Amino acid sequence: MASEWLRTRGRGVHLTIRDVDCRDFDAERLAKDLHDLHVNVLSFFCAGYITVHPTSLSLRTSPFLGGRDLTGEIVAALHRYGIKAVAAMDLSLIPETVAGEHPEWRSLDARGEPYRANRDLGNFYIACPLSGYQNEFLEQVLRELVSRYDLDGIKFGGGSYGFTSYGNGICYCSRCREAYRAFSGRELPGREDASDPAWGAFQRWRREAVVERTRFLYRLVKSQNPDLPVMCNSVCFGDPGWTLRGALDIERMAEHIDAVQVEAQTRVRVDGDRGEWQFLLWPSEEANFLTSVSNRQIWVLASYFQAWPWRRNAVPPAEQKVYLAQFYANGGSAIVNLSGGPPAVHQDRRGFAAIRSLYGFVERNRSYYEGDASGANVAVVYSQNTLFYYDREQPGRYVDAIRGMEQAFAEHHVPFDLISDTRLTAEHLAKYRTVVLPCTACMTEEAAESLKKYVENGGSVVATFETSLYDPDGRKRDDFLLADLLGVSHADTLQVTGREDGVYKQAYLNVRLGDHPLLSDLGDTTVIPAANRYCRVRLRGEKAAVPLTLSAAFRVFPEGMSYTLEPDPGDPMLVAREHPSGGRTVYFAGQPDLAFLRFGYPDWGLLLTNAVRWASGGRLPLEAEAPPTLLVTLRKQENCRLVHLVNLNGGRRMFRQMIPARDIKILLRSEPAFRPRRAFLLSNLHSLPLAEEKDGVSVRVSRVEDYDVLVFEGDADSR
């Protein structure tokens, strides 16, 4: 690591300084208020389209600055309170005066016309990441900052990495044309067209260019000061629009960054009379994924305000606290994006209570947030190639399949890691009992071979829908690459309701083996709803159990004619195999993961969870008897097991008041090298009775209001 402070979890705020804030900015009061909020890291925009210090460079300084060196004032004040100062910059926008001097720095459309940032701004152009503005000129900006201020880090805004900013499309400037020609031997595509095979090649170039861009920025900072940490701002797959248009591969980018920051800002995006809510578990998703694929310090940025569009109003404290707590429950650190001025002058100060409460809790108990690692033995796989090249017209469906798994496991309290398909190697898979493939369609032969060997060595695999049916470039194969492993061959992909004929229809999964463990706790029913598409498959080999088959579809209306006399066609919808090694495989021919996220019928979540429990042979490290709205994660330290409890039961969002979770039972399964001797909650440190169970120890927690951590402390000789 580049600096000692990166070795510990942080409690951050990011401040976007507006022009008008410079008029009466009180740096000393800012530092004091942040200290009172238990903040130990502040990043703040100081250079770019708004610069808040005197400069000899062609940067736009705030008209309200009045000759002040606000950057210097902030850094000095922060250090007086022991807060780290990270200077952030965003050179994605070029002021008109600078663009006039260097028109070659602008990003161009196919007609050679420059892209303008939001036209109402009027005098800003969008910079190409390959241009001199974000390269040679950036070096001068950086040199000025590093030589002048005692900074603890440099952070580059999101516009510094990706190839889209403020709505621009493909850049046709000379540097982009030359770079793409050298990469592919082709000219740039004429338009964005996900169905065009050439688009895939273009996206691969952009992905490589973004990684190279990340490497360049890292080296640039280190050339100025080898010990100065570099932070980024990007996003994981949970925002597919930004990920795809920006060609962002955060896993590879993280290799060239000291501290990785990704965003989970959006709560609900309101546009006119329409509103779209973001996934409530998005904070967990991002922290979980990045801590699984990177050994860098992980920051996840969430808005203080109600994004989007209300930058001035705070997220209600009840929701904010449990939203931010998810970062810490999954190994990350929270950084709150503050817009609208420093805390003392903010128009809505109601949200600061949540930050003070959570950050104070983390600070008081910081030893339990250091040196921890995930205790999960189930891995859910994300595939960058599947997002980019599989369902190109609706990539959100793939993300929703992953999130359906996340939602099911969260509701049933199954600890899991989100890993990349690049981790499908013997070394990385060794720590997992079960690997889950939610429609991991684009799969390499190397990954498939690793999974086969994994099962041969006793591991288990759960897969859904078109997993392994496509190559890494999105070309459809004749059969599943995992056909032998899963025991099925692909025949066709169809709607569960059959061909479209104008009749509103329904279809079901018929229960065929009601006593199979995969159908445990299903209750007194012989049918389960079937939704979306499915793969018609043929069984391969013997010794496969088929607990569910697809019914014939039939009409919904009129009710008196809503039935079918057609026989069950017998298409397998759930296929389970036990392998000689002791490993198990489960294949869902349909899309229960996607359906569970979008429509929420509980049977789908139960089936997915049963699949993991059965595949894992009952060897999950933790079991919880708790409401489905209590998020439970497991972290490990050398002599502790840490069960993070995040209560997400606040009724209708945005949460105004949390409904406490009560009478929770946590069973920690026995480990050969760890013997619990004491259990307590970090909120009060009072010891809780340990009850010996057949395969571990259990504890009862009477109440969780919003966020707490249950600590199992081991014997002194536990290792």
Describe these PLM feature segments.
Residues 16, 43-50, 89-96, 155-167, ...:
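Short, solvent-exposed turn/loop segments enriched in Gly/Ser/Thr/Pro and often Arg
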Residues 1-52, 56-88, 374, 631, ...:
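Mature N-terminal, pre-catalytic/accessory segment of carbohydrate-active enzymes
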Residues 12, 39-44, 70-119, 153-158, ...:
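Glycine-rich, aromatic-flanked loop segments that form ligand/cofactor-binding clefts
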Residues 30, 35-70, 93-111, 163-175, ...:
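Aromatic-lined carbohydrate-binding/catalytic grooves of carbohydrate-active enzymes
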Residues 20-36, 134-145, 242-253, 316-324, ...:
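Short, acidic/polar
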Residues 39-41, 152, 333-334, 433:
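Short acidic/polar active-site loop segments enriched in Thr and Asp
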Residues 87, 91-149, 158, 174-207, ...:
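Active-site-adjacent "subsite" loops/lids of carbohydrate-active enzymes
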Residues 2, 7-9, 85, 199-200, ...:
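Carbohydrate-binding surfaces of carbohydrate-active enzymes
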